[in-house]
Amino acid sequence: MEKPPVDPQNPWLELRRLTPARIALGRTGTSLPTRAQLDFQYAHAQARDAVHLPFDHAALSAQLNERQRESLLLHSAAVDRNSYLQRPDLGRKLSDQSAQTLREYAQAHPGGVDLVIVVADGLSALAVHRHTLPFLTRLEEQMSADEWSTAPVVLVEQGRVAIGDEIGQLLGAKMVVMLIGERPGLSSPDSLGLYFTYNPKVGLTDAYRNCISNVRLEGLSYGMAAHRLLYLMREACRRQLSGVNLKDEAQVQTLESEAGTDMKSNFLLDPPPA
């Protein structure tokens, strides 16, 4: 089926067809059309709902158990959602009880582990509910050849990114991978973020972490996200570092190969007409 011709009077319509971004909305007088205004309000409501949606850790734990994956439930020092939103520092550290739980687990399982995966609600529990299991499935498939010892999956209520460093340190983990709901956008209320740290410990800054963002069906695919993360993990083990000194070369190779095989599908890469 042929694509409809581009309206020469409004070339923005062709770009609008290729992106969920709010472009080419039209106008009614000096204002937005009613449809565009209602869509904006609906997207804003979705983003707010995603921020305040409670983390259904019980359902996620049950699904992990069905896949023979043990899990631990912990809580940050933020006692509730309001505290979490108003005091970001409390979301970066464990509650006293949760820290003690991890110490007891580490004493019962001495020797440390290579990898601990932490799942936190962050600013979008919706992202965690939708994407955690599909992503972990692809990650486990691709890392089956790597003989890394793993801790139980750690589920954290009211958690922020840096809390993974404390968890990794208490468990004696060589690597920590944090899966966390990202701040909702007006076109993406369910983006999952991945944060990787080698040799985690309390006090590390973002410079020591690698981030893979926008993991969702309309963004970065589960398989590609797992591929990029595994590249970082293997390189981190080889070079014994992470963060700004560890570049994601896997991304460059993938983009180059896609550009060579699928150039015609990308309007930005199409050659100009003769």
UniProtKB/Swiss-Prot annotation:
The protein's annotated pathway: Amine and polyamine degradation; ethanolamine degradation
Keywords noted in UniProt: Bacterial microcompartment, Cobalamin, Cobalt, Lyase
Localization per record: Bacterial microcompartment
Cofactor entry: adenosylcob(III)alamin
Residues the record lists as binding adenosylcob(III)alamin: 161, 182, 211
Origin: domain of life: Bacteria
Signal sequence annotation: none
Catalytic class of the enzyme: lyase
A Gene Ontology term for the protein's cellular component: ethanolamine ammonia-lyase complex
Pfam family, one: EutC
Alphabetized InterPro entries for the sequence: EutC (IPR009246), EutC_C (IPR042251), EutC_N (IPR042255)
Cysteine-cysteine disulfides: none
Subunit annotation: The basic unit is a heterodimer which dimerizes to form tetramers. The heterotetramers trimerize; 6 large subunits form a core ring with 6 small subunits projecting outwards.
Similarity comment text for this entry: Belongs to the EutC family.
PANTHER family (UniProt xref): ETHANOLAMINE AMMONIA-LYASE LIGHT CHAIN, ETHANOLAMINE AMMONIA-LYASE SMALL SUBUNIT
Record's function text: Catalyzes the deamination of various vicinal amino-alcohols to oxo compounds. Allows this organism to utilize ethanolamine as the sole source of nitrogen and carbon in the presence of external vitamin B12.
Protein name: Ethanolamine ammonia-lyase small subunit
Gene name of the record: eutC
